[in-house]
A protein has these predicted regions:
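Walker A/P-loop
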Residues: 14-38
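A short beta-strand element within the Helicase C-terminal
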Residues: 292-317, 323-326, 330, 341-346
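Conserved segment of the helicase C-terminal RecA-like domain
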Residues: 321-326, 330-364
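Acidic, glycine-rich low-complexity segments with interspersed aromatic residues
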Residues: 457, 471-482, 495-497, 609-718
């Protein structure tokens, strides 16, 4: 049994009467529905108390799609048991058949709908179910009372308040998104090319609402040149061109025809027969009536099945990952003689270019580093045989857009939250966002939600009308502190200690160490235990202001130097009248920390709370290295030695700001790094003694490399951890210019490091690519 059949079978026989099938454009939702209906028709299970499936209604939004669906069902189910297939649309009025395929526009007419009894159909399928919040769909679904209703869509998420998941009782029969479909080889591979839109007189265009520019002869020639350069798969081109407006599509079609191409344009006003004829001319064999391209704005975003398309051209900005994916999907259906589809995306300096990597990857976490990696490495992070390439000028535009993008806005967080809530049918927990491809829930901790603090609770209290939990000011403050400092899941120790206190009403060092070893395989050192207590007793503060502000945010109190107990403040917070809501929020946060740790940080590097190739901030590093006090980024500078833990992190900003001291840190290759010391350091300085381990006390010093690609991004000041390294040879004296612009030089020394593990190739290329 197909997985979609199996899940639908379970839902169908559980007593539910609706479900949703989510499948990427091009993966064959219609065939999946046909096979599912056939499977259910062949079953004989009287115990489910549903009447046999004899009559089926398939509702679509265009006649052309109804015709294609009718043909697909007829192929799968056949007619050996008397099945008949008909169309109900503006041009067809077949009502007396066992399988009826109808357009929503015709069926929703009162004079048509009244001809059907509420129980006229046993099984109803709603295609493009994300439209089902519209009034016409509501009308039909309210009229009919089938045994079962199945919604089908590639994109159930909507930008309005309509909840598609609720309409289908939050029952998901099957879900496969674009990335998975490519992984499973269900789609035709695509070769995506991000191409610079036209410059006129060697100047980049700024106003892309300028109709004269959009339809200029120069732009037409530019598009044709690139289309010829990147070709297509098959005997002749069969392309779709998506434009910004109907007028642009019309004029560009006329101009392309002047270049011996055969094109037409279609709009929402085009008659069904005109659309059908155009599609047949595009998809068919070469001949006098054949078309090379159809130009449109959005009528081919969904539903229409044209497997023969071998080239898709985007002449409009990406404003929505959903629409981008829908339009990309027009070319992803497999067809005979078609090895791949070519995607040409003409990219100007648009503000929302950062949405392109989101759409191509299908990653809705909005993690900027993931976006950059796709732009830089493209093909290496796209599954299957598909490829992604950007021209350098385009790549720079998209990277700049990523730098400038705000990916933790209230609007974005609320949209992602609502999508997950709609899907689940309840208020999501923090752990729900990852498995349902939601935004990285850490972003909820990055904003202050009025007086509620920087936590998921703060977001819920401010924006979720169905949330009834209430915390005291101190509880909200404590939750905000835990979320901001430990919510990223880079270390589980603090979360485990809080959990131990909640579950046992108190705890001590011995019990905690036993639990840490038993549950996570971590042998707690004295330095780790000391650092945890400092962090949970308001003694490891980033600033003096924080210490004063958080003076009552104390979870444990030290007992001597080797033990601790629950702090009075935390004990009160766990036992006042709002403690139940507080504990629910704490447990949700703890579960999220464990989840994130398991996903990203559980492969600990040499018994340290660091994971190779993961990212860490200036704030993370002193804590995770178990330093006894926080050291600011300004004091750390490029490196800092801690004598208690015998650790020396080296922090490299690979893209320097223009006003930075001219440090020439660079990789020679994946194994060797050249780095400079701080200024006013000589080859016989203490820094050189430590780095080159010239004294016995420095023999076991751990020199740890952290590198980040971009220093200008205010949202993601994080460094890749690339492991331990060792200085080789000896310090080489150099003179570097001072920052004051006087040209005066100061002393420093150069170090050649050898990494103990070569930098992973994709990270190396991403960091070093200019």
């Amino acid at each position: 049994m197909r997985s979609s059949d199996k899940k639908l079978d379970e839902i169908y026989h559980s007593g539910q009467n609706r479900a949703l099938l989510i499948s990427a454009t091009g993966t064959g939702k219609t065939y999946a529905a046909a096979f599912s209906v056939k499977h259910l028709m062949e079953q004989k299970k009287p115990e489910h108390h549903k009447r046999p499936i004899k009559k089926v209604l398939f509702v679509v939004h265009r006649e052309q799609i109804a015709i294609q669906a009718k043909n697909s069902f007829a192929r799968v189910i056949g007619s050996e048991h008397g099945q008949t297939y008909g169309l109900l649309s503006g041009n067809h009025k077949d009502k007396e058949c066992t399988f009826l395929f109808s357009t929503i526009q015709t069926l929703s007419l009162d004079r048509i709908l009244k001809d059907f009894a509420p129980d006229a159909f046993d099984f109803i399928i709603i295609d493009e179910a994300h439209r089902s919040g519209a009034n016409s769909y509501d009308k039909i679904m309210a009229h009919f009372q089938p045994e079962f209703g199945l919604g089908m869509t590639a994109t159930p998420e909507r930008t309005d308040d309509k909840d598609v998941f609720k309409i289908f009782n939050h029952q998901i029969a099957y879900e496969i998104r674009l990335k998975d479909a490519l992984d499973y080889n269900l789609l035709c591979p695509f070769h995506y090319h991000g191409i610079s839109d036209l410059k006129i007189n060697n100047e980049e265009q700024k106003d892309f609402s300028n109709f004269a520019y959009l339809t200029s002869d120069e732009r037409v020639k530019h598009v044709l040149q690139k289309a010829e350069e990147f070709k297509f798969s098959g005997e002749r081109v069969k392309g779709l061109i998506f434009c910004s407006s109907v007028d642009e599509a019309k004029v560009l079609s006329e101009k392309l025809n002047q270049h011996n191409l055969r094109t037409t344009y279609l709009t929402g006003a085009s008659k069904p027969e005109a659309r059908l004829a155009a599609v047949d001319r595009l998809a068919g064999a070469d001949g006098p009536q054949a078309l090379d391209y159809i130009l449109t704005v959005d009528i081919f975003n969904e539903g229409v099945d044209i497997p023969e398309i071998n080239q898709v051209i985007f002449l409009r900005p990406t404003q929505s990952p959903i629409i981008f994916t829908q339009q990309l999907g027009r070319g992803l259906r497999k067809a005979a003689g078609k090895e791949y589809v070519v995607i040409l995306d003409f990219i100007a300096n648009y503000e929302k270019n950062y949405l392109i990597p989101v759409a191509l990857s299908g990653d809705n976490s909005y993690d900027k580093d993931s976006m950059r990696k796709l732009v830089m490495l493209g093909t290496k992070v796209i599954p299957g045989a598909s490829t992604v390439e950007f021209e350098k000028v385009v790549r720079d535009r998209v990277l700049e857009s990523i730098d400038n993008a705000r990916t933790n806005t209230v609007e974005l967080l609320r949209t992602s939250y609502q999508a997950i809530k709609n899907k689940l049918g309840r208020i999501p927990n923090l752990v729900d966002f990852y498995p349902h491809n939601g935004i990285d829930a850490v972003k909820f901790f990055e904003k202050k939600w009025a007086h509620y603090g920087s936590s998921y609770y703060g977001f819920l209290a401010k924006y979720e009308k169905d949330y009834t939990g209430k915390l005291s000011p101190l509880q909200a403050k404590m939750l905000s502190y835990l979320s901001g400092r430990f919510g990223n899941g880079k270390r589980v120790a603090e979360a485990l200690l809080i959990e131990s206190i909640i579950n046992n009403k108190n705890t001590n060092a011995d019990f905690f160490k036993e639990q840490l070893l038993k549950r996570f395989g971590i042998d707690a050192s004295d330095d780790l235990l000391k650092n945890i207590v400092l962090n949970l007793s308001n003694q490891f503060n980033l600033t003096g202001d924080q210490k004063e502000r958080n003076k009552d945010v104390v979870f444990v109190e030290p007992i001597g130097t080797e033990d601790f107990r629950i702090a009075d403040a935390f004990n009160r917070a766990l036992n006042d009248e709002t403690s139940s809501d507080f504990i629910v929020q704490l447990n949700d946060l703890i579960a999220f920390i464990y989840q994130r740790y398991d996903l990203r940080y559980s492969k600990r590097y040499r018994c340290m709370d660091l994971t190779l190739n993961e990212k860490y901030s200036y704030e993370d590093i002193p804590r995770l290295l178990n330093w006894s006090k926080y050291i600011s980024a300004q004091i750390i500078g490029g490196y800092r030695y801690d004598d208690e833990t015998n650790t020396l992190p080296v922090l490299v900003n690979y893209n320097k700001e223009d006003d930075a001291i001219a440090y020439e840190d660079h990789f020679e290759n994946e194994e060797y790094l050249i780095a400079l010391s701080k200024t006013n350091r000589k080859v016989d300085s203490k820094d050189a003694e430590i780095i080159f381990r010239k004294q016995p006390e420095y023999k076991n010093t751990k020199i740890l490399l952290f590198v980040r690609k971009n220093k200008n991004d205010s949202e993601t000041k994080t460094f890749y951890f690339l492991g331990e390294m060792n200085a080789i040879g000896g310090p080489e004296p150099v003179a570097v210019p001072k920052r004051d612009g006087t040209g005066e030089k100061v002393s420093a020394f150069k170090v050649r490091y050898r990494l103990e593990s070569n930098v992973r190739r994709d990270i190396y290329e991403y960091i070093t690519e200019s």
